[in-house]
Amino acid sequence: MGNISSSGGEGRRRRRRNHTAAPPPPPPPPSSSLPPPPLPTEIQANPIVFAAVTPYPNPNPNPVYQYPASYYHHPPPGAMPLPPYDHHLQHHPPHPYHNHSWAPVAMARYPYAGHMMAQPTPYVEHQKAVTIRNDVNLKKESLRLEPDPDNPGRFLVSFTFDATVSGRISVIFFAKESEDCKLTATKEDILPPITLDFEKGLGQKFKQSSGSGIDFSVFEDVELFKAAADTEIYPLAVKAEAAPSGGENEEEERSGSKNAQITQAVYEKDKGEIKIRVVKQILWVNGTRYELQEIYGIGNTVEGDDDSADDANDPGKECVICLSEPRDTTVLPCRHMCMCSGCAKVLRFQTNRCPICRQPVERLLEIKVHGNNGSGNNTGQGETVEQE
């Protein structure tokens, strides 16, 4: 009987030992890369306070990592997913014994998804520019009115032009342009068109013959200074055709199908004096109409025949960004030629503003200027870059 009682007591004691709760796992060793942050002053001075604010350990910890309440934010809709976990740089989650109010600084390794969104690469379209040869070029800054010495009150039209081939110049008053680039004089009975043949040459000067000038006193101010954009009638138009006169294709030349440059101008009154202002210049090449645009700074990039010291040290020839390479890229639509192609390719990924006027950039036009022979008819080979 004693043996049975003894064995029963041992069995009960053995069963009690089997149901004893296992002790909690020891805390992980601290990270060697970053020291734990210091405790607050009041906790260091009073350890009892630290024990009071320490949360009771959870016997069933959640296997999913819980972000500190002061750190986690709900990501906005459409945010990029988090990058893969980096086992070399990340630190283990804080032990439940640690206070969440002072999470380790290394927890910043878990980035907020909104800051990881990469900037989209701008869409860039490359197009080849068209090279056009302009055989006749009227220098629009030279277009002016001169008083007729033999006929007081009348004014003669004069200008300077360059021509690489022979051709014909026509001056039309109150001209209207048709679809095939043909100019029609709307007041031909009062001011008939003036036509003059020319030979090839540079720096040629045109001037109306005496007695054929315009008398502004016979016209109303509304007719002279009316906006040409409203009526599509320009008070003055000059058409320079690059076509030999008297050839077998004379009828084709009169139809306007030959290469030509058209300069359209209006009259303006400045301090009682009537002056000419050029509105636009048009190129008609192989049946296609092109409108010429000024490029600011292209004159500084053309290497002329003058090799003087002042020209060699001209600071306007270099790129405004690197200050070393020559300018060969124009910003559109402001038309500032101010950069080299290398800086332009880098700049378009950083900003969409012109370095000169800070206007938005729509296209970058690279122009390779072959040289300047003094004619002003330089041709260019370039590439346009469209950025959206």
UniProtKB/Swiss-Prot annotation:
GO molecular function, one term: zinc ion binding
Residues covered by region (DAR2 domain): 159-281
Mutagenesis / variant outcome for changing residue 321 to A: Reduces E3 ligase activity
Superkingdom, natural source: Eukaryota
Quaternary organization: Interacts with GDU1.
Described purpose of this protein according to its UniProt entry: Acts as an E3 ubiquitin-protein ligase, or as part of E3 complex, which accepts ubiquitin from specific E2 ubiquitin-conjugating enzymes and then transfers it to substrates (in vitro). Required for GLUTAMINE DUMPER 1(GDU1)-induced amino acid secretion and for amino acid homeostasis. Ubiquitinates GDU1 (in vitro).
Protein name according to UniProt: Probable E3 ubiquitin-protein ligase LOG2
Source species: Arabidopsis thaliana
Gene of this entry: LOG2
